[in-house]
């Protein structure tokens, strides 16, 4: 659906892997521990299509922003989850396969090119800033720490790039989960 219509996508922590992290339409994880580009993309969108997301404080950093001055479409198979933490403009109860089959049968006539160009530029700036901070942090630690120290963020990124494309990543709860979600490169729409 997103590819057919060129729709930018973000993900909660639980939804990571729905799209590969290097997919051109994927702008990052949202929430308190989310990525800058993902949060900004969602907060500045005119329409937010939430699929199976709970809108809890950890998954959405500012629930008020996803309902403020925008259309919120919330799809979930469980009617109890819809509107639980943020009131949708359009609630849709159903199996996402059936909902998206119906969506895909329609032709959207919306031009997102300007929005996508802005998001791509912003993502490139954020990624460059992030890489610079990561490199500086590694350089600073090399000066202060022993040679046995490995920056966990760099380790997770390097390990994920070395893994098979269909690898499934597992992270325990804690800071390592946050590092994994923020730094692992998930390809082929796998799982975190």
What annotation goes with each model-predicted range?
Residues 6, 76, 88-94, 143-150:
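Short, exposed beta-strand "edge-strand" segments with a Pro/Gly-rich flavor and a Y/T-containing core
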Residues 1-45, 161-192:
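Anionic-ligand anchoring segments at beta-strand to alpha-helix junctions in alpha/beta enzyme folds, i.e.
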Residues 123-192:
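Active-site diphosphate/adenylate-binding microenvironment
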């Amino acid at each position: 659906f997103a590819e057919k219509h060129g729709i930018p996508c973000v993900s909660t922590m639980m939804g990571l892997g729905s799209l590969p992290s290097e997919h051109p339409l994927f702008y990052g994880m949202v929430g308190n521990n989310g990525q800058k580009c993902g949060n900004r993309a969602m907060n500045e969108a005119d329409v937010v299509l939430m699929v199976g997301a709970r809108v809890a404080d950890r998954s959405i950093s500012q629930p008020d922003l996803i309902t403020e001055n925008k259309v919120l479409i919330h799809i979930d198979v469980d009617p109890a989850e819809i509107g639980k933490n943020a009131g949708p403009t359009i609630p849709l109860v159903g199996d996402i396969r059936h909902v998206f089959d119906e969506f895909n049968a329609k032709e959207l006539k919306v031009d997102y090119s300007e929005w996508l160009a802005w998001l791509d530029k912003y993502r490139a700036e954020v990624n460059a800033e992030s890489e610079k901070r990561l490199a500086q942090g590694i350089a600073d630690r090399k000066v202060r720490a022993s040679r046995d120290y490995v920056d966990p963020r760099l380790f997770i990124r390097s390990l994920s790039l070395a893994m098979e494309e269909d690898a499934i990543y597992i992270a325990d709860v804690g800071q390592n989960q946050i590092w994994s979600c923020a730094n692992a490169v998930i390809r082929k729409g796998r799982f975190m």
